[in-house]
Each structure stands twice: as structure tokens, then as C-alpha cells.
Amino acid sequence: MIRRLLPRTLRARLTALIILSTAATLALSGVALYSALHNRLVGMSSYEMSATLAAMRTHLANVANVDDIPRKSDLWIDQLHGHQNLDLAIYDTDGRLRFATRGFVAPRPALGAPQTRVPASAAPAGATFSYLADDAPLRGGNPRTARIVVQYDGKNDHALLRAYAYTVVVIEVLAVVLTAALAYGIAMLGLSPLRRLVARAEQMSSSRLAQPLPELDTSGELKEMEHAFNAMLKRLDESFVRLSQFSSNLAHDMRTPLTNLLAEAQVALSKPRTADEYRDVIESSIDEYQRLSRMIEDMLFLARSDNAQSHLAIRTLDAAAQAERVAGYYEPMAEDADVRIVVRGKAEVRADALLYHRALSNLISNALNHAPRGSTITIECAQAADAATISVSDTGRGIEAPHRERIFERFYRVDPARHNSASGTGLGLAIVRSIMENHGGTCGVDSEPHVRTTFWLKFPAHAA
């Protein structure tokens, strides 16, 4: 409800909130101060009446009987010296008035009745007077008590409270008006770095993403927002660069088989051919078609993975047994390349079986492409408390450090000379990374050139 009432702009909202909080604080302060002053005045009036009543009781104790009360009027008047708001009266036990000062106004009859306990007080509704009454013993005579009634005129106190309330209201209204002006200026000043940030952001374009926003002369939340915005620009720039490289590599990789297909078709049609020659052309074209098909399938898989559209059938797998199964698919290729594939260790992974096979298959295929003849490809399964690690190692020429960070990027190849190789699409390792991200795991590579290269997959104990 409050959000709907607040202005939409941040500047107006800050101004309104400052005004509202200031007005509420001033109002509460004014009420508290008014209450404190009122209580103070009530306390002072009660003290004056009680003190005067006590003094009157002391003096009446020396009076012989009620008939002597009117004769000592000067004494009773002296008790009010310095108490300009007080008046008093003395009654006998029959309720007859024996003495009263000039400003005394007769109270309700109950105050004139005899009292046996604590002093009685009263404040008639709508009147400014308040009363305190009590019985006082006399020295002798009959009756032996007299009734004292002390009157306090609160007219001056009420006038003071009204003037104070009026002054407080005027001051608070002026303070709110001044606060509104100051709040607007403070909001404008406080949001000036944000306006500069907005102006700079409006100038951004895809060609200027690499240029960070200027440093703001501020700290705190705006500084954090500036850093977050610059970090976002950096990520966007990196994404645009990768997208540009991806588009370039994709165009180049698709152009090669299309060029081959076109060239073969043109050569085949340049003159009459025998059936065997046409068969050779068609078989060669099929290889290029298959390469294009694999590339498109890999790209579709990555697109589905990036958009989280693939459904994972997560279950517990025997990592070593599944690795043996995948390695069996590559035994014929390994025999042709004179390479052995060995599976070691034991571990359990929480993964989608098909995707686990595909990730491991891509790593084994990659290792076969680089393993020297007569060498061994080792698949190692290791179990830890928080994760299971599956690694594929070969003893090929290895990967230099500058290439390791980018080896899992799409279409990235360490050896440009192999760029047009028909052995792969350049998306195998990118697919591996996508599969691991979908499982909440990680992948990486450790390589010592010309000694050993190990690609590893780390599956968390509880898959995402």
C-alpha cells in the first residue's frame, strides 16, 4: 500500500521519504515535549497545593475553635504569598464557610464534607480550577476539626500550553518546508553520480563494451553498482567476442565441406564420367555430409544445453564399468592406431548415463587423435567424499599453457594446421564442458608437454 502511494522516480521517492520521516520525528518530538511540559505543570500545581495545605494544617492546630478562624484572616492570606494561582477556604464541620480568599470559587459540595482519610482532590469538567481538601484538627473547642480547601487556577497554565502547542506546530511546519527543500537538494546531489552513470550507459554500444564506465567520486552502494556494471560490461564484451569468433569459425568450418562438395560436383559434371567415378564422387560427398551433420547435431546439443532445455535422467553409475563400456566402442580404432586403452580405479557418479557416455567418448576420441603409436590411454576413476573424478590421459605432445584456458571453447583448436581436419568438428570439448555444467560439475586439463596430458571430469557427490 505504501509503495503505491510513493512517487515513481527515485529522486521524488527519496524526497518524500525524508519529508515523511522528518515530519513524523518532529510530530512525535512535539507531542513528547508537550506532554512533558503538561506533566511538569500538573506536578508543580499539585506540589503547591499540598505544601499550602500542610502549612494550613500546622497553623490551624493553634486555633482554639472555628470562631477564631475569621479573626486570623491575615495569617491565612500570608500562606498564599508567592503562590499567585492559589486561593483557599476554611469550612466548619457543618459545611459553613468560615474564611475564603477573594479569588476562591465555591467547589462542589462534596469537598466541604468531612474527610477521614487522605486529602480529596477534584478538577471540575470544563473549568480551569482544581481543588485539594482535607480536615485539620483544632487545639480545642467544639467542633474539634475544620475543613481546608485549596484552589489552584490553571488558566495561566492552559494559556502557556496553548501558546507552546501553537509555537511547536508553526516551527514544525516551517521545519518540514525547509526539510522538503533540503531533501530535494540532497536527493539531487546524492543521485548526481547515478545520473552521470546513466548518461555514460546511454552512450554504450556493442563496439564500446570494452570501455569501462568512468570512476565515480563516491563510495558505498553506488561504487558497488559501478563495479558490478563494469563487470557486466566485461562479461558482455567477452560474450560478444566469443560470439564473433564462434560465428567466424562456424562460417569457416561449414564453408570447407561446402566448398569441397561444390568442387567435386563441378569436376564430376565437367565431362562424362563412368559409373565408378560417379560412385567415388558420391561417397566422397557422403563424408562431407556426415561431417556437416555431426557439426549441426553438436551445435543443436550445445544450444539445448545452454538454454537448459535438456532433461537429465540422473542416476548412480559405476564409473569404471561405464568407462569400460565406452572404451570398448573405440577398441577397433585403438587397434588400428596401435594404442591401448586401460581403465583403472573405482568410483560412482551421479549422472545421466547417455551424457556421461558422450563426455567420456569425446575425451577418448580426442586422446586417440593425439596419442602416439604404441602408447597407452589411461582412464582413471577416483572417489572422494565430495566428488568423483574421471580422468583420461595420453602421452601425446601435450598442450602449451596459453591454450589450456581456451581449449574448451567452441571451434578452438590448438593446432591451426588441423583446422580443416575431417576428424572432428571442433565442438567436442565444448560439449564436454556443457555436459559438466549441466551436472553441476567441472572439467579441466593438466598437461606437461611431450610427457602427459590429462583431461578430467569432476562430478559432485550430489548432482545438480
Swiss-Prot record:
GO terms for molecular function: ATP binding; phosphorelay sensor kinase activity. Residues 188-241 form the HAMP domain. The chain crosses the membrane at residues 14-34, 167-187. The keyword Kinase applies. It is an enzyme of class 2 (transferase). PROSITE patterns: HAMP, HIS_KIN. The modification Phosphohistidine is found at residue 252. It holds the Pfam family HAMP. Residues 35-166 are cytoplasmic. Residues 249-463 form the Histidine kinase domain. SMART domains: HAMP, HATPase_c, HisKA. It is found in: Cell inner membrane. This is Sensor protein IrlS. It comes from Burkholderia pseudomallei (strain K96243). The lineage of its organism: Bacteria, Pseudomonadati, Pseudomonadota, Betaproteobacteria, Burkholderiales.
